[in-house]
């Protein structure tokens, strides 16, 4: 467990420089191929084929409070707040009672295809997705740093660590209903790979000189073959409990014997209404569904309060300059006081909902120049560890029918203000897009973090640094190949190709000779053939 938490914490630090809660800036980006993932009623200008490996990479992540409240520079070295050179007063003045919230949501597109069939737009794609999130109360950090000097009572409730990974295969369809309404849906088949959820809804610590009294309520659920969850017999409790310190990745994993840890399904639904040519109102609900996970391990806290005897030399602080050593030291101490009773529920299924989200937006195009628009977007995401809400305004400009840019500003409930930008370049065959939901203004140099994490098997792959303040962003990048005729213009409206026709010369009246004894029959007037507007 120490290894998992240490690596996860380092990974969150390493990816935060390019990470957010989704792709909000792209919602109104003209020509964006994967708009149907934000709202299934959005239709692409043309059909497309996504190149495997580079078609779409999305990483969403963030944290609050900022790393500047947790990482400190002492004697030229970057250390955590647990380092003994960081004073208790220095740490508490920066944290200011803030709870910790972190999230990481990578989304890798494996295959994607979009095509038009008549007036309907369809897509099929396969993706690898993951959700990792954690939430810890301020009292946990106060205990780790200040110990019994701060208080005799600590409330560690609402501690949550969640991680899940799954494969998604989805089919979507979007079509017009009348002249100004579009609706769409997206049906998903899900195959679970790994799931772990540790939820301590209640945990109160009453610290005595010789013994600590702990009252906790929570559980742990694990599904999948990628993690090993050992148990051990606790003589004091007289029960078999989880060996929390030794939870680790499976070392003898056999890919040939691998089976999904669960199956499930989900649906996206969305609609776009255009009451006027310059105004659109849209809304979508995404990821309504879940996965039935096969239980690998399940454990619960004891029904009664229990006591914990700390070691005489127990200390959360350390003089080590290694961030991983500091995290490991704290994790080891916390794990030793957590008792989770093992339950015999192997093989039983538990249905777990996906983190779902809802988007509502309004887009207003300039009446004098419809290549410029102002978009407003509200987002709610119901996450496993905490919920996320944001309001974003974007200014979008299609300089040409093949080149679009977008800039945005957002405010969210994580107390972050973010500024994002995106570009979409789609001349003919190629469609290339790149964007961020937030651009950091202050960073911690990468070299400082690399030195502190030197004992981990990876380096931070970013040249500048990682965000210093509280951060919530996202990066998306991809290349697709366009194919077929154009069915929508840059604004997502029906594409009408104008066909010029030459006027036929007027016909002079002709004298008709009718044989004697026959009547003249009425006939349809001659009309000049025209070429109607054609949708492409």
Q: Residue locations for each model-derived region?
A:
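Bacterial N-terminal signal peptides
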Residues: 7-16
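Subset of outer-membrane beta-barrel
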Residues: 21-536
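N-terminal secretory signal peptides that target proteins for export/translocation
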Residues: 1-2
């Amino acid at each position: 467990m120490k290894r998992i938490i240490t690596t996860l914490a380092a990974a969150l630090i390493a990816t935060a420089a390019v990470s957010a809660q989704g792709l909000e800036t792209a919602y109104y980006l003209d020509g964006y191929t994967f708009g149907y993932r934000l709202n299934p009623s959005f239709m692409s200008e043309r059909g497309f084929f996504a190149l495997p490996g580079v078609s779409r990479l999305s990483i969403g992540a963030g944290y609050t409070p900022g790393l500047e409240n947790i990482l400190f520079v002492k004697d030229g070295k970057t250390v955590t707040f647990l380092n003994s050179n960081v004073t208790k007063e220095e740490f508490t003045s920066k944290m200011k009672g803030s709870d910790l919230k972190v999230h990481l949501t990578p989304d890798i597109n494996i295959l994607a295809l979009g095509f038009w069939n008549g007036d309907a737009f369809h897509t099929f794609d396969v993706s690898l997705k993951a959700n990792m999130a954690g939430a810890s109360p301020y009292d946990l950090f106060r205990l780790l740093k200040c110990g019994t000097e701060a208080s005799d009572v600590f409330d560690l409730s609402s501690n949550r660590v969640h991680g899940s990974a799954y494969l998604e295969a989805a089919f979507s369809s979007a079509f017009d209903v009348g002249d100004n309404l579009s609706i769409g849906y997206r049906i998903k088949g899900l195959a679970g790979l790994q799931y772990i959820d540790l939820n301590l809804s209640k945990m109160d610590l009453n610290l005595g000189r010789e013994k600590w009294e702990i009252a906790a309520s929570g559980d742990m659920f694990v599904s999948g073959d990628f993690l090993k969850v050992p148990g051990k017999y606790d003589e004091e409790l007289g029960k078999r409990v989880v060996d929390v310190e030794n939870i680790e990745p499976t070392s003898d994993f056999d890919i040939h014997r691998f089976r999904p840890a669960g199956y499930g399904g989900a649906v996206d639904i969305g609609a776009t209404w255009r009451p006027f040519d310059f105004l659109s109102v849209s809304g979508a609900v995404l990821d309504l569904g879940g996965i039935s996970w096969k239980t690998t391990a399940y454990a619960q806290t004891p029904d009664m309060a229990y006591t914990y005897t700390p070691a005489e030399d127990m200390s959360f602080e350390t003089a080590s300059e290694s961030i991983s050593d500091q995290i490991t030291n704290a994790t080891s101490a916390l794990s030793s006081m957590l008792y989770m009773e093992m339950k015999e529920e192997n093989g039983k299924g538990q249905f777990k909902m996906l983190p779902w989200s809802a988007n509502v937006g309004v887009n207003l195009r300039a009446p004098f120049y419809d290549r410029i628009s102002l978009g407003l977007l509200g987002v709610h995401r119901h996450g496993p560890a905490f919920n996320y809400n944001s309001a974003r305004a974007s200014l979008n400009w299609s300089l040409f029918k093949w080149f679009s840019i977008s800039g945005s500003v957002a405010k969210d409930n994580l107390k972050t203000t973010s500024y994002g930008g995106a570009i979409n370049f789609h001349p003919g065959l190629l469609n290339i897009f790149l964007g961020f939901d937030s651009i950091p203004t202050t960073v911690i140099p990468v070299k400082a973090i690399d030195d502190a994490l030197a004992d981990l098997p990876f380096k931070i792959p970013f040249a500048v640094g990682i965000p210093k303040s509280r951060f919530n962003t996202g990066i998306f990048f991809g290349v697709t190949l366009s194919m077929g005729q154009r069915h929508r213009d840059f604004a997502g409206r029906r594409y009408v190709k104008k066909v010029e026709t030459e006027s036929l010369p007027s016909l002079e009246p002709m004298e008709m000779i009718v044989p004697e004894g026959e009547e003249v029959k009425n006939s349809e007037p001659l009309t000049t053939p025209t070429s109607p507007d054609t949708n492409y």
